Amino acid sequence: MIYLDNSATTNPKPQAVKNAVIRAMNYYSFNSGRGGYKESVNTSDMIFSCREKLSEMFGFPAENIAFTPNCTTAINFAIKGILKPGDHIIISYLEHNAVARPVYALFKNGIIDYDIADFSFDKEQTINNFKKLIKPNTKAIVCTHASNVFGCVFPIKEIGKLAHENGIIFIVDAAQSAGILDIDCKSDNIDILCAPGHKGLYAPMGIGFIALRDNVEIGTIIEGGTGSNSMKLAQPDNMPERLESGTLNNVGIIGLCAGIDFVAGKSVSSIYKHEKNLMKYIYGKLAKNNNVTLYTPSFNDAFLAPILSFNYKDYPSEKTASFLADKNIACRAGFHCSKLAHTAFGTDNRGTVRISPSVFTKYSECEKFINILKKL
């Protein structure tokens, strides 16, 4: 199979990640923070080492990183933990439903108000689109780093600066950028970062994280056992226990730890360079095919991540993807859990076909995809 659906989840996983998962099942299937025996302590140490690796990669304090089942849960923690009745929030027109639906639910229930900022391939215009929506009660700006549909990259550093100049919390959804684009909480002015493990960090499914800068106060939407302060009914104030109730996914965390090592060993910049070059090649070939409709300008790494949406002739996107699937090429068709993005780009009638490479994707596979598509 030629796998070009890495925006959904990277596949294959590195052998080191597979080995780590097996090792975790054999040696670290103990409840961390719940026992003083050696195996429990060793498990706790392994989990903290993963926090330290995330801290090194993204710049957040290790103790401010909490593990979640996925990025969607992390985003819900961020949005619902920050906003209070009467608050206003700004999101973008390229948000995944992981952002749009929690915000809309709070709005529908009369708790908050929100506005949506347009994306422009002119960086200054994008920043101004956010700026003009700021109100006295704006509490947060939530922004995807890279669109999961069209690959559009937001200028998060500048948007974060704008937020901080106005006393606004800046939350970044890094589902499509963690492990692919460089991210640093300080230089990028990020207050809260949410990301999955199973995409650009090459971890197993079922593990993600939320990371906070110091002095960011966040409420809870889940309370329970944390292994600490058990004789108090109130959820602990300190991180990461504040956002980690219940038994952790040790296997996923240790797999994530190995995934981070894999990415760090190759370097984020080299992974991005490989994927960018593949996407430039694919884009150039598709642009010469009169039957292909592309929705973004010629591939430019200043504003595009290695994600590409297209359509073929006037076919429904599912028909194109089904044809490719019959030829053993995996991609994603439809609306990609992103109503706002498809509405913004005018593809809400038939969706798009999305392709996305990984560090394991080969030029020969991309060439075969291009040649097979011509036969549709």
What are the roles of these predicted feature ranges?
Residues 1-376:
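Pyridoxal 5′-phosphate
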